[in-house]
């Protein structure tokens, strides 16, 4: 039987949003990444 982690704890800092989304792509499905993008957009952060 395989044990599944309840939580994954990763602490990492990003200097560019492109790096953040590349990192998230390894862990989340496209819909989840889209929801994170909407949340970031609601914060008013501009991608340069």
Swiss-Prot record:
Classification via InterPro entries: DUF5377
Top-level taxon of origin: Bacteria
Designated name of the protein: Uncharacterized protein HI_0234
Taxonomic lineage: Bacteria, Pseudomonadati, Pseudomonadota, Gammaproteobacteria, Pasteurellales
